[in-house]
Curated annotation (Swiss-Prot):
Name listed for the protein in its UniProt record: Chaperonin GroEL
The reaction(s) this protein catalyses: ATP + H2O + a folded polypeptide = ADP + phosphate + an unfolded polypeptide
Function statement: Together with its co-chaperonin GroES, plays an essential role in assisting protein folding. The GroEL-GroES system forms a nano-cage that allows encapsulation of the non-native substrate proteins and provides a physical environment optimized to promote and accelerate protein folding.
One of the GO biological process terms: protein refolding
Organism from which the protein derives: Halalkalibacterium halodurans (strain ATCC BAA-125 / DSM 18197 / FERM 7344 / JCM 9153 / C-125) (Bacillus halodurans)
Gene name of the record: groEL
Induction conditions: By heat shock.
Localization per record: Cytoplasm
Domain of life the protein comes from: Bacteria
Record key words, sorted: ATP-binding, Chaperone, Cytoplasm, Isomerase, Nucleotide-binding, Stress response
UniProt key word Cytoplasm: yes
Subunit annotation: Forms a cylinder of 14 subunits composed of two heptameric rings stacked back-to-back. Interacts with the co-chaperonin GroES.
């Protein structure tokens, strides 16, 4: 296929048009008075959202060069979302500001490679300063504030804070659709580990690509199963009971896996195989945890047990198991509560004894899985459209809260980014490197400008006053008042703010150093297709 090539200024200008189209669509959602964006869906009702990354992913432009520019900024939103789970709109606003400001200087003859150095240096200083002004999150109220700011809903803030209190900061929190109008919290005892199904043919819900087993038996072993004969006796006993089975083993492969899949597709019985979590000694400990939770036994040669002679009484039970491509969640295991409590105490004792941070972290993960349970946020709404929008906001709020617990919080509303300007200004840079630093300095003001603009105010006036205010004081766009942001509960997770800045700087630097852009030439359709000429159907006369 023939290619279209653009160079230097022409290339960058074409890509900038794409950047602007995407960023302008995303940035209208920023702040407490940000608007929504409606996304067309080919099937079902349209999606109304204010989630930056969801909007960015939907945008596909006709012009190939513009589309490349748009995709670069979509990458900023996507990467920020992957790492911090929120802050995608802020990241997009920062990236657009850096790219536009940088392009002015490159057009004026500045060296983009030296500008890049300045951008990287300024970003590094800004990130370090953010860490210094970050405050650890304390108590249920602080958690509720972070979630409420992210979701723009105080009620959601309270529910997420309660969920994290009930299952712990490391606990598993899932989001489901509710049948009613209200959003409520349900805490279910259970355990989740990061291993998915051995074959996608095992799924029972093809829309969500997950396998759901109701009241299954759970076979737990540290052996590799490649021959179906090894597990046939116990499988026959399970089939007689008419129940599904979850098989947790070192691996299930070859003939054994094929037999399980074929029987599932034929509807003979429902079995899902997953690999055992962890490695080495940690794997044995986690299998033992699962066995205690489900009331089963680990079938291992270490204890003189053999798969061929395994009995249905050695299998665990659970009220429900959900297996996705990457995770398995066991809900309401049938284990005895006193045995579970004893295991929890044993892990707590190990946490006290261990000196390794890594071991301590892994033990705490195991503890959360055994003792924490699974919190289910059931999202309610009047219509399907509202439901989708609320679900997205709650997902963002949950990610934001987790990020806050991890790295602390800073003043929200773009205030923290303006507060680090002083530190960035003190960088001793010269020439085009200083230009790079100035690009970041100008971009740091942009989120505040945009929040003010979305609230119908002049951004420059707000920014100038904010620079004169003491650190932590900022503008509450929801009420139009100047307040202590942290005391007013207007906070952002440090991790979200940091990730947004780092990813915006990274993509902007790449954009400015682009000198040629290559795209496929659009194909010209000749003749317009359609049916071939039938010659007036005259050739059918001989059939009479």
């Amino acid at each position: 296929m023939a290619k279209d090539i653009k160079f230097s200024e022409d290339a960058r200008r074409s890509m900038l048009r794409g950047v602007d189209k995407l960023a302008d669509a995303v940035k209208v959602t920023l702040g407490p008075k940000g608007r929504n964006v409606v996304l067309e869906k080919k099937f079902g009702s349209p999606l109304i959202t204010n989630d930056g990354v969801t909007i960015a992913k939907e945008i596909e432009l006709e012009d190939a060069f513009e589309n490349m520019g748009a995709k670069l900024v979509a990458e900023v939103a996507s990467k920020t979302n992957d790492i911090a789970g929120d802050g995608t709109t802020t990241a997009t606003v920062l990236a657009q500001a850096m790219i536009r400001e940088g392009l002015k200087n490159v057009t004026s003859g500045a060296n983009p490679m030296v500008i890049r150095k300045g951008i990287e240096k300024a970003t590094q200083v800004a990130v370090e300063e953010l860490s210094k002004i970050s405050k650890p999150i304390e108590g249920k109220d602080s958690i509720a504030q972070v979630a409420a700011i992210s979701s723009a809903d105080d009620e959601v803030g309270k529910i997420i804070a309660e969920a994290m209190e009930r299952v712990g900061n490391d606990g598993v929190i899932t989001i489901e659709e509710s049948k009613g109008f209200s959003t409520e919290l349900e805490v279910v005892e259970g355990m989740q580990f990061d291993r998915g199904y051995a074959s996608p043919y095992m799924v029972t819900d093809s829309d969500k690509m997950e396998a759901v087993l109701d009241n299954p038996y759970v076979l737990i072993t540290d052996k590799k199963i490649s021959n179906i004969q090894e597990v046939l006796p116990v499988l026959e006993q399970v089939v007689q009971q008419g129940k599904p089975i979850l098989i947790i083993a070192e691996d299930v492969e070859g003939e054994a896996l094929a037999t399980l899949v074929v029987n599932k597709l034929r509807g003979t019985f429902n079995a899902v195989a997953v690999k055992a979590p962890g490695f080495g000694d940690r794997r044995k400990a986690m299998l033992e945890d699962i066995a205690i939770l489900t009331g089963g036994e680990v079938i291992t040669e270490d204890l003189g047990l053999d798969l061929k002679s395994a009995n249905i009484t050695q299998l665990g039970r659970a009220s429900k198991v959900v297996v996705t491509k990457e995770n398995t969640t066991i809900v309401e295991g049938a284990g005895e509560s006193d045995k579970i409590a004893a295991r929890v105490n044993q892990i707590k004792a190990q946490i006290e004894e261990t000196t390794s941070d890594f071991d301590k972290e892994k033990l705490q993960e195991r503890l959360a899985k055994l003792a924490g349970g699974v919190a289910v946020l059931k999202v309610g709404a009047a219509t399907e459209t509202e439901m989708k929008e609320r679900k997205l906001r709650i997902e963002d709020a949950l990610n934001s809260t987790r990020a806050a617990v991890e790295e602390g919080i800073v003043a929200g509303g773009g205030t923290a980014l303006v507060n680090v300007i002083k530190a960035v200004s003190s960088i001793g840079a010269e020439g085009d490197e200083a230009t790079g630093v100035n690009i970041v300095l100008r971009a740091l003001e942009e989120p505040v400008r945009q929040i003010a603009h979305n609230a119908g105010l002049e951004g420059s006036v707000i920014v100038e006053r904010l620079k004169k205010e003491e650190a932590g004081f900022g503008f509450n766009a929801a009420t139009g008042e100047w307040v202590n942001m942290v005391e007013a509960g207007i906070v952002d997770p440090t991790k979200v703010t940091r990730s947004a800045l780092q990813h915006a700087a990274s993509v902007s630097a790449m954009f400015l150093t682009t000198e040629a852009v290559i795209a496929d030439k659009p194909e010209e359709n000749e003749g317009g297709g359609g049916m071939p000429d039938m010659g007036g159907m005259g050739g059918m006369g001989g059939m009479m």
